[in-house]
């Protein structure tokens, strides 16, 4: 006898008594397969095994409801009870915070609340005095009323018994919206130098700000502009407007000169031209070391160069606080921004060769000759690790022109040169750091023909194309001219110092000729 489809709804999901939503009617025992129509329209074939899991008749009275216990999250078993209890109590507050962040970031289900907030803030600022005069005594009562509404809302949400999954989902949403709200500031990645530059620029432009407040924008109007800009920053039409305005070079220049900050993504990610040049240099030197290390692996050395830049301010003296549009306090030879000696780190090679950089000099040393611009007695050291405050500087005018070795009232800028030698070595290279010359096998492999007196420790700088410049500047000759600096290029073609080789050959021939004459005599 078939069962009544309206009296035997069976859930498809489970076969336990707790998963049944209604009573099961009495079924005649049969050996065949009978069909049971569930309440959801799902047909389940009844077998003896299926009927054996249930009693012939439910013990619950007719019309009673069975409460289904929700399935617990796997996080519940691994989360301490105290943490779970704290999260459940904080859940209503998280919902309120999520709602506020959604309104401020314009990511709520509807944007009408955000528009209403902007309108209310505008009216409050414009008619603040009237509001205080007529409704000031009611503001405290209004705040208490809002708190009571929020308290009832919290109690109502706590009675709903949220699951741990709901709390985790709400926490994730709050975290994402908080990051979105703070992204305009966090994306700048401001360093201490950037903050100092911003503070200095703001103080420098204070007279202009005061004039603007007195003549153009009263404090109430300026506050209204700032509040509207903040409340509508994340709206879609505001983002489109900023993108269109940012295409103008005038707007970008205005932002730069008023803040001293560079808002380009390249600067935010710290991918300056200096680091780009260093990456190219490391790649070149890595190839050279790999080729030179076939039979006799030796370290490749060169000297890092940093320039310290300062400006004179009337009443203050020489300070590293420069103008926002000029060079930074520390630069490389190409005026690219660089880290200070205290924060300078050797680059890391992200490859499988295992080679790494290490310092040869214990500390940064000041080049007292400033790359040969200053003449020193032969008895005096050319570098020092503990210089005096005004030692080793070259002085310039206000536009970094007309260099001079002497300070004067017409000089407002100056800079000096710091150097430190490093070497690129392989993990198994335990050779002494005193051997500074490049192995002969390396010269043959790379295609470099060097004089015997030339060593890698004389290398002074590396530019973005991988050119290494040496400091092999000889003393001035009788005519008062010095030989030009020579450069080593790590290219496919070999570089030959024809002048040096010819001089060595001439000296060698002269010595051999003199020895032959003495033997004949």
Curated annotation (Swiss-Prot):
Keywords of this protein's UniProt record, alphabetized?
A: Endoplasmic reticulum, Glycoprotein, Membrane, Transmembrane, Transmembrane helix
User: Where do the segments described as Disordered lie?
Assistant: 1-26, 425-446, 465-486
Question: What is the organism field in this record?
Answer: Ogataea parapolymorpha (strain ATCC 26012 / BCRC 20466 / JCM 22074 / NRRL Y-7560 / DL-1)
Name-wise, this protein is: Peroxisomal membrane protein PEX23
Lipid bilayer topology? Multi-pass membrane protein
UniProt lists the family membership as follows: Belongs to the PEX28-32 family. PEX32 subfamily.
Name the glycosylated positions. 23, 53, 189, 279, 463, 467
Residue stretches of biased makeup (Polar residues): 429-446
The cellular component terms of Gene Ontology attached to this UniProt record, alphabetical and capped at eight, are: endoplasmic reticulum membrane; peroxisomal membrane
Tell me the compartments it is located in: Endoplasmic reticulum membrane
Listed under GO biological process in this entry are: peroxisome organization
Report the Pfam families cross-referenced here.
Answer: Pex24p
Q: Name the residues that span the membrane.
A: 111-128, 133-150, 198-217
Please state the span of the N-terminal signal peptide per the UniProt entry.
none
Q: What does this protein do?
A: With PEX29, contributes to the formation of endoplasmic reticulum-mitochondria junctions which are important for mitochondrial function. Involved in lipid dropplets formation.
Give the source's domain of life in one word: Eukaryota
For the null mutant, the annotation states: Results in aberrant peroxisome formation. Reduces the number of lipid droplets and leads to fragmented and clustered mitochondria. Also results in retarded growth and reduced mitochondrial activities.
């Amino acid at each position: 006898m078939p069962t009544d489809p309206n009296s035997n709804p069976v859930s498809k999901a489970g076969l336990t008594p707790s998963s049944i939503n209604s009573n099961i009617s009495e079924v005649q025992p049969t050996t065949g397969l009978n069909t049971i129509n569930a309440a959801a329209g799902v047909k389940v074939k009844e077998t003896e095994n299926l009927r054996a899991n249930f009693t012939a008749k439910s013990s619950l009275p007719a019309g009673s409801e069975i409460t289904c216990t929700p399935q617990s999250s796997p996080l519940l078993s691994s989360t301490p009870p105290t943490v779970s209890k704290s999260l459940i109590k904080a859940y209503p507050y998280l919902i309120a915070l999520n709602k506020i962040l959604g309104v401020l970031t314009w990511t709520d289900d509807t944007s009408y609340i955000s528009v209403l907030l902007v309108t209310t803030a505008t009216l409050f600022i414009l008619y603040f005095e009237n509001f205080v005069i007529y409704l000031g005594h009611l503001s405290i009562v209004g705040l208490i009323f809002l708190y009571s509404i929020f308290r009832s809302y919290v109690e109502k949400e706590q009675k709903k018994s949220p699951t741990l999954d709901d709390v985790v989902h709400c926490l994730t949403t709050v975290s994402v919206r908080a990051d979105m709200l703070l992204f305009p500031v966090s994306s700048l990645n401001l360093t201490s130098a950037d903050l100092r530059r911003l503070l200095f620029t703001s103080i420098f432009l204070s007279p202009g700000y005061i004039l603007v407040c007195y003549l153009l924008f009263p404090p109430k109007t300026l506050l209204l502009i700032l509040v509207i800009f903040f409340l509508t920053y994340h709206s879609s039409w505001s983002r489109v407007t900023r993108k269109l305005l940012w295409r103008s070079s005038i707007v970008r220049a205005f932002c730069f000169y008023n803040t001293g900050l560079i808002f380009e993504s390249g600067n935010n990610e710290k991918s300056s031209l200096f680091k780009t040049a260093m990456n190219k240099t490391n790649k070149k030197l890595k190839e050279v070391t790999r080729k030179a290390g076939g039979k006799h692996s030796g370290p490749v050395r060169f000297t890092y160069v940093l320039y310290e830049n300062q400006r004179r301010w009337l009443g203050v003296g020489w300070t590293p606080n420069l103008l926002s549009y000029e060079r930074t306090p520390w630069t490389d030879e190409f005026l690219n921004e660089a880290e200070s000696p205290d924060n300078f780190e050797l680059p890391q090679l992200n490859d499988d060769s295992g080679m790494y950089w290490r310092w040869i000099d214990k500390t940064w040393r000041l080049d007292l000759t400033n790359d040969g611009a200053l003449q020193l007695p032969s008895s005096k050291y050319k570098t020092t690790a503990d210089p005096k405050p005004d030692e080793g500087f070259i002085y310039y005018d206000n536009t970094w022109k007309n260099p001079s070795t002497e300070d004067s009232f017409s000089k407002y800028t100056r800079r000096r040169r710091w150097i430190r030698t490093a070497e690129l070595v392989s993990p198994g290279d335990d050779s002494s750091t005193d051997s500074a010359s490049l192995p002969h096998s390396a010269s043959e492999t790379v295609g470099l023909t060097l004089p015997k007196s030339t060593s890698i420790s004389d290398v002074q700088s590396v530019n973005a194309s991988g050119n290494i410049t040496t400091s092999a500047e000889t003393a001035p000759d009788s005519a008062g001219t010095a030989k030009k600096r020579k450069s080593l290029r790590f290219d496919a073609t070999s570089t030959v110092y024809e002048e040096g080789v010819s001089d060595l050959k001439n000296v060698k021939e002269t010595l051999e000729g003199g020895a032959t004459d003495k033997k004949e005599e």
